[in-house]
């Protein structure tokens, strides 16, 4: 497994893994596949997404994209977003590698994320890297907040 930071020139790989994540595991995201298909499915839109402030990472098995995660700056630090690992690549440490890439990129900044309430696999992966579920109910999108306490 190889985790790489990606940019606008990697738009086709990001498109592949993002659309796959939203198609195969729609319940894991507040976003939907319709936000990234149809009229919005253009090279310009994908390049723009990968040009936004922050960083995007793809996990590769050989040359095949099998996971993704993003990191974006916020007023309070950095937010980990859009984490996903392909079903055939799960339980191989890829999720941990993607989380570690964001932790390294954030370089000591306060890290937060939102996770769909009840997503046990994601909660376990995040907890293994020091994230703690915050008190309170799920938001309007069914998400709970986790913070990384260092």
Feature roles, as predicted:
Residues 2-17:
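A short beta-loop-alpha structural element at the N-terminal edge
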Residues 23-45:
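Conserved GNAT-fold acetyl-CoA-binding loop/helix
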Residues 47-58, 79:
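A short helix-loop-beta-strand connector motif used in the catalytic cores of GNAT acetyltransferases and
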Residues 58, 64-72, 77-84:
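Conserved beta-strand in the GNAT
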Residues 60, 83-90, 115-118:
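A short, internal acetyl-CoA/4′-phosphopantetheine-binding micro-motif in the GNAT/acyltransferase core
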Residues 89, 93-101:
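Conserved acetyl-CoA pyrophosphate-binding loop and the N-cap/start of the following alpha-helix
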Residues 112-150:
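C-terminal "cap" of GNAT-fold acetyltransferases
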